[in-house]
Amino acid sequence: MKALKNAGQEEVPSAWKMDLVIYSDLFLVNNTFDELYTYAINLNPAVEMALWKGGKMTAQVILPVATNLSGEMKRIRPGIIALSQDVRFRHNIFGKMTVGNFTNNRYGAQLEIKYRTNNGRWELGGTAGSTGFSAITREDGWYIGRKQRINASLNASYYEPRLNLQFDLKAGRYIYGDYGVRGDCTRHFGEYAIGLYALCTDGEINGGFHFAIPLPGKKWSRKGFFRVKPADYFAWAYGMVADGEYIEKQLGKSYSTRPNENRSSNFYQPDYIRYFLIKELQKEKSK
């Protein structure tokens, strides 16, 4: 309920104010016989700035901390460097356009559009992108490939309010031309989210789990033009299949266009907010 105390007051605008957000990243895969796991631990600070209504700039750098991998994984390299524009149309239709350098060594442009019902339980939409290869190499420095690859998907999401469950279904074309279907089931606990997923693409099956947890310092206030803060959440996903044709053909590959993509950040489902506020009110009454 504390979040509602200042609901009637106008927020301080954050346009053209800069945040330095410190993200952490863990890469962990079991796909070799000579080592139990290949791993990489990185710190990924990002400068984030709201430019105007719906507009945002992100500039991120990846700083390796520890790894048993070689090549690019040991080098300081660019992370997400992007400009994005969110637009809300009439009749609960939302759009987003992003251009720049993304995760998984991709650069290019992506368009997202979705429709949300009045109660927020159903979402239907689509995503389309055109990206090329981007990497830091010893020979070429920052290499930018010219070949573009098309990815696209149709997406559906449903929120079940009684159990606080979110179901997501996505069908489409992944980065390297394979076609597949992915389903996710996520349980929300306050600001925590944990879920399972299954993916079938080009006849290969994969699955795993993902979670997002809030980090201390998430509610740091802003006192000037520049603010340094930790990331709001730590998110991680694990897939069971890490070898064979699934890896050799790079099946099911996708990318993120913003550093804070996870199942908790920007989850503003009306039924869940109502449920969460009722629990907070009951706690205050019981004191």
Predicted regions and their residues:
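Solvent-exposed loop/turn segments connecting transmembrane beta-strands
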Residues: 31-40, 51-53, 64-77, 99-109, ...
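Outer-membrane beta-barrel initiation region
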Residues: 1-83, 145, 279, 284-287
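Short loop/turn motifs that connect adjacent beta-strands in outer-membrane beta-barrel proteins
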Residues: 10-19, 52-58, 88-94, 118-124, ...
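Transmembrane beta-strand segments that form the barrel wall of outer-membrane beta-barrel proteins
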Residues: 20-33, 57-67, 83, 90-102, ...
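Flexible, glycine-rich linker and terminal segments associated
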Residues: 1-8, 135, 144-145, 151, ...
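Feature captures outer-membrane beta-barrel proteins of Gram-negative bacteria and organelles
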Residues: 41-52, 76-89, 108-128, 150-160, ...
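Outer-membrane beta-barrel proteins and related beta-barrel translocases across Gram-negative bacteria
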Residues: 1-2, 19-26, 42-48, 56, ...
